[in-house]
Amino acid sequence: MHLKPVETVQDTPTFATADPTILGPIPMEHGLILAAIIFAIGLCGVMVRRNFLFMLMSLEIMMSAAGLAFIVAGSHWLSADGQIMFIFILTLAAAEASLGLAILLQFYHRRGHLDVDSANEMRG
């Protein structure tokens, strides 16, 4: 009795089994420079814009840049601390956004506009 060999299908490499050293890791300096640029863009938005909504959006950009810096540092030192700090920053950003939007709605309801300069005229 003659047995025929079983044909095997050759496995093709997937993303999970591909060589991770093809592109190499992103240097920590590049990630921190990107975070600093994003933070500076947010800071310029806070300093230049007088609309309350745009100021809130700029604050969110700044908090995202801080989170990116923690993620980059954590991945550089192979530590989960950066990811944990990012979760804290994300939670803080959500609380800041909800409180900021509540203040924004009340401000718009009372004033009819979102100009921050007129907030100095508010009375207690």
Swiss-Prot record:
Its EC number is 7.1.1.-. One of its GO terms (molecular function) is NADH:ubiquinone reductase (non-electrogenic) activity. Belongs to the complex I subunit 4L family. It comes from Psychrobacter sp. (strain PRwf-1). It is an enzyme of class 7 (translocase). It is a multi-pass membrane protein. It catalyses: a quinone + NADH + 5 H(+)(in) = a quinol + NAD(+) + 4 H(+)(out). It is found in: Cell inner membrane. NDH-1 shuttles electrons from NADH, via FMN and iron-sulfur (Fe-S) centers, to quinones in the respiratory chain. The immediate electron acceptor for the enzyme in this species is believed to be ubiquinone. Couples the redox reaction to proton translocation (for every two electrons transferred, four hydrogen ions are translocated across the cytoplasmic membrane), and thus conserves the redox energy in a proton gradient. GO terms for biological process: ATP synthesis coupled electron transport. The chain crosses the membrane at residues 28-48, 52-72, 84-104. NDH-1 is composed of 14 different subunits. Subunits NuoA, H, J, K, L, M, N constitute the membrane sector of the complex. This is NADH-quinone oxidoreductase subunit K. It comes from the Bacteria. Keywords: Cell inner membrane, Cell membrane, Membrane, NAD, Quinone, Translocase, Transmembrane, Transmembrane helix, Transport, Ubiquinone. Disulfide bonds: none annotated. NCBIfam families: PRK05715.1-1, PRK05715.1-2. The keyword Cell inner membrane applies. The keyword Plastid does not apply. One of its GO terms (cellular component) is NADH dehydrogenase complex. Pfam families: Oxidored_q2.
